[in-house]
Each structure stands twice: as C-alpha cells, then as structure tokens.
C-alpha cells in the first residue's frame, strides 16, 4: 500500500529537482493536526487514511501528516500536488504531460534498479526483491484522478490511489481518464518500465497496473456546503462571518493552470526558482455564498414557528418571547440578513393571515403552518414561486373579474408599510392585494437583502489563487458581500 508515498521517499534522492518536489509531509515527522472521522485518500501522498481539512481550500482532502506543509491543489506554488492537478477540459496533450511528468520524476531503468538494489542489500536480514523493500519500484503510471467538481470547472488531481473506501462523504470522486488518452499507448509505457524490473517485481507491477488502469469512473459530484470545514470560519464583528485560508504563492505567474507542468518538462530551472520564492499568504474572505445561505436557512426553518401568523405579538418573529412562537435558535450562527428576511416575511404573512383567516391565537394549529414552512425553506430557489401560489390560496382569495384578491387591512409597522408603498409604487397602502401584488411584495422582501443573481454558489475558498490576489489588491476580498446587496437596498439609503 501507499506506493506513491514510498516512491516520493526513495526517488527524492535521485536529482535536485526530485529533492525539492518529492518532499511530502507523509514522509516527515508527525505534527499535531485537527482530528477527523472522514476516511479517504490524501491527495498529496495518495494514502488511505483519516483526513483533515486543508488550510488552502477548507476541503477535507489532506492527511494529518501532509497538512503540516499547508499545500493545496489551488496554490500558485508549483509543488508536486499542484503539478499533478489538471483543470478541465481534459485533452490528450494534458494527459501526455502527466505521463511525461511521471517518467521524469519516477524513472525506471537499469541504473535506478541497480541503485535501489545496492542500497537495500547493504542491510541485513532482507530477502531479495521483497515487495516491502522495493515498493517504490512497482509504482505504475496510471491516469486515475480525484475529480473536484466546482461550478465552472473540474480539477483532476492525478495519482496512484490504492485501497477501497466509501466516497459519499468525500469532496471528490475518482475518474479514469485513460479513454481520453490511449489505453494501448499507456500499456506500452508501463510494459517498457516493467522490462527493467526483476521477474518477481514484474508480477507485482503488472497486477497493480491492471487493477488501477481498469477501474470504472464515478460521476463527479458537485461540491456542497457540507464539504467545507467550519473550523476555518471566524466571527468578525456582529454581522459578518469570514473564512481564513492560506495559499502558497511565488514571484512567478503563469497564464493557464497547466503552464507549470509544461515548464517542468521544458524549463526545470524556472520551477526550481519558483520553489525558492514561495511564501504562504493569508486571505480573509467573506463567507457569503448560495450553498451557505441554503444551509443556514434550512437550520432556521427547522426551528421556525409558523403559528406566529395567528398571534398578536408586537415583537418580530425572531425576538418574541412566547411558548408557542419563540424560535429556539441561535441567530448569531447565521447571516444577519437571513434573520431580517425571516422577520419581514413572517410579519407580512401575519398581516395577510389576520386580514383573511379567522384564527384564534398563536397556540392554535392550522394546516397552513406546513405550507408556510415549506415556502420559507424554498425562499432562495425557483420553487418559491410555486409555494407563493399555495400561500396566497391559504388566505381564501376572492375572484373579481378573473382576478384573485385578498384583504390587507391588518396594521403593519412603519418599515413594512414604507417598503410596500415603494415596492408597489403607490401613494397609500392598499386594502386589497391581488395575486400579482402579493407575490411582488413577497419576492421583494427576499431580494431586499440579497441579489441572488450575483451571489456565487460556493465559498471563495475554492477560488483560484490569482483571483484571490486580485480581490485582495482591490480591497474587495473581505468586504465583497457589500457589493452583492441588491440595488433596492442602495436606493433605500
């Protein structure tokens, strides 16, 4: 097992380039790391072990040994993990560069085999060509990669991943890219490497190669908010939660993601110079993204009390102290605007409910409560239009000239009063609301705080390093969420 890790340990003594590139944390002394129950493959050393979160992207893809070097596949520094990473789309030229990189860093020829045999025989009590002592020589060249599916692209991290484990809780899936290359050509490359090995090691090499090169591909799954660690989140002030990440940057810049790999094959001195100028740079990013909004909203809706719609409370829904209406939820754990949306929507729906439905008090149960909870859960999705239609018909609308109306004569506070007047572009608050007016107000209460069309789906911790540097230089890295407020909020100021 862990042939890739053993190969990095033994091959790092071959050349100066290997000495710089093949130094991984799994072959160094262990340092304390945050524990985790997630079992998977470390993308840096390829061994199957317990994973912890990466300091560069907050994903669980690094083991407790390799995390000490703080390397991420999104770094700007051309370390081994970065060189093994290819950005979609996959082409034959990119795969050919991966094969050449393996041949450059992990060569197998007569001199290499002789060197390892000599270094092994100088120790006693070792049988000739035992797999445990020549594990580095049976590292096959395969095109199996761990695919991390972001919104706009897929990152393929190539390596030799051994063993079996459940991939459902991992941020990546394994894909076999051999069909995009040439299966027969890859077989020929590995057969040439096997020819230099002793007969006993050839059997091990052939078995590993055919097992690894014939595995089926899994469908890459898009990242979700649960894939990102919450341990990199910090509270910054009363209203913002930010994420601290670290990326390795250098003085050298490349135009495309694969340029460092091409320079490794054509200009090794540039790679060595870039490795000498690397530094770890912190980035304090905002945590506003669509997946986090859905995650926080689902937690809030789980504790929501729709019976507030039947109450006479003066306080907002999030601050009321009532056995039936109070929300047992810590609002400091979610974005402050979600709390405002929850209060505004519940306040508006209560006015509609008290104007049309004969309900007793907040302690009474109503079939409408399930409809309200379902609508709150879909506030940020396209399904909200359908749930708004169901909500409107819960208020017993009356049809006049093929237009449905509900009453709206229950008192509202000045904030909602002024907002409805500006939303409907009218001079006074109407006593009846049509279906179009009802949905316009309901959608505007959500869009008042978020311009969902401008919010990215995933956290900025998965963004490329060059984009983080650009945002940091413009001063929009930590304060970028201010730019995502809707235009209606700007007009209010």
Curated annotation (Swiss-Prot):
The keyword Metal-binding applies. Coiled coil: none annotated. GO terms for molecular function: metal ion binding; RNA binding. GO terms for biological process: symbiont-mediated suppression of host cytoplasmic pattern recognition receptor signaling pathway via inhibition of IRF3 activity; symbiont-mediated suppression of host cytoplasmic pattern recognition receptor signaling pathway via inhibition of IRF7 activity. It comes from the Viruses. Pfam families: Rota_NS53. Residues 1-81 are annotated as: RNA-binding. Keywords: Host cytoplasm, Host cytoskeleton, Host-virus interaction, Inhibition of host innate immune response by virus, Inhibition of host IRF3 by virus, Inhibition of host IRF7 by virus, Inhibition of host RLR pathway by virus, Interferon antiviral system evasion, Metal-binding, RNA-binding, Viral immunoevasion. Residues 319-493 are annotated as: Interaction with host IRF3. Residues 42-79 are annotated as: Zinc-binding domain. Residues 82-176 are annotated as: Important for cytoskeleton localization. It is found in: Host cytoplasm, Host cytoskeleton. InterPro entries: Rotavirus_NSP1. A motif (pLxIS motif) lies at residues 483-486. Plays a role in the inhibition of host innate immunity by inducing the degradation of key host factors required to activate interferon production such as IRF3, IRF5 or IRF7. Associates with components of cullin RING ligases (CRLs) including CUL1 or CUL3, which are essential multisubunit ubiquitination complexes, to modulate their activities. The integrity of the zinc-binding domain in NSP1 is important for degradation of host IRF3. This is Non-structural protein 1. It comes from Rotavirus A (isolate RVA/Mouse/Brazil/EHP/1981/G16P[20]). The lineage of its organism: Viruses, Riboviria, Orthornavirae, Duplornaviricota, Resentoviricetes.
